[in-house]
Amino acid sequence: MKIGNALLAASLLMCLGQEAIADNTYILATGRRDPRMYAIDLKEALKPQNNNTPNAIVSRSKTALDRLDGKLLGDPANIVISEDGKTAYVVNHHGAIDNDEFQQHGGRGNIAVMDVRKMTQRRSDNTAEALEFHIDSGHFGAVGLVLLRDMFVIGNAESHLTEDGGNRITFVDRKTGSLRGAVELALGKPGFACPDFPVPFVSPHGPPSPVPLLSPNAAWGCFPDSNGITVGTASDGKHYLFTANGGTNDVSVIDLAAALAGSKTAEIARIPTQIGPWGIATSANGRWVVAANRESQQIAFEGNTISIIDVNLAAARSPAAEVARVLVGTSDSNVQTRPFIPSFTPDGKFIVVPNFRANNVSIVDLSMALAHQPGAEVARVPLTRPADADGVVRPARPKGSAVTADGRFAVISGGPRTTFAASGTVWIIDLRTGTVAATVTGVGNDPYGLAVVDRGD
């Protein structure tokens, strides 16, 4: 662990929750290549005898019905919990696919609507009992998800059967699944001519041979390929969508009211970032947005910073809306750390950042970052994994993050994609000490997003 100084460590300790761990608190982690949702009992995970074991896993819920030949289907990459905590909305990035067969990008995304109580019951293990129904995402490569009262707002990162070509933010009715509209984001300015706008759909049998399928590719840069999506609130009460545009190395600002009125010009600004961002999050008060600058889709280069955006300045279309850029995962600006999916603590004072390439997690003090003080990364927590089934110890490769409601623990998902079933990992970090309190093994394969729920029995 790296701590800036004793005063900062004390500040971190004072700001975070001190309450006892509640019963019926669960981590819900996406299994990704293992297309199930993993429910982990937090209290059980923290028991010393369960460390570095899968013992705290309560159930593994299917995110799609099995194929007729018995193959598991689905591609869970993100999860958002309903306002009442009873329903989980799981984003199947490429829909109900067989991960062993579907080896490229650009599948039709869907949302699996799942019952949280059933997901956290042992009798649901390896069943589809918690799955209620699917909702089509309205486009391809769904990743980001925001809940409005009546609608889903979905970030679709790709086009049909290719990782590039994503420029649609779709609005889908939560009750019926009807596609109500879409915002088509402007194309980027990569320095060469871009295709006609809007993006045409390619043949349902696959893209023509000249179309590149996977990044990095020097011909990309036209399409935003939006990954994460979040909502910020300006001081006047107006709401804005922010999308992390991995393809154009920036963040889009969308006037939510205009988008809901069907405006074709709801995107009001673009905020340049270090490199293509992936994860994005908003502080509890809605004032600050953080984007993790992951990697370029044009060249083999990974980022090492987070961008902090002032919602008021973004709403005003100010070119100075990125008010801070913080180096994470390293003290050397030449080292690529690949930050992934950030989270705010509930009080909005700290940002948790998993750094995929650096195999660590950064804790960033927001006030220090905004003041441009050195040492805003007040803690850096190294992560390790036990050996896989073949005896090889592989890197941690953290991706997803979430924070418990009391602010005491950060939960991190990770592990490289392997040929072994259930080879992923979840780490539980005690934010009072900046150390790993527990490690849960056997959580999916290449897990991405995760959430913490209090079942409230």
Task: List where the protein language model places each region.
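Bacterial N-terminal signal peptides that target proteins for export
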Residues: M1-L7
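Bacterial N-terminal signal peptides
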Residues: A9-C15
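Predominantly soluble domains enriched in secretory-pathway, periplasmic, or organellar proteins
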Residues: E19-D457
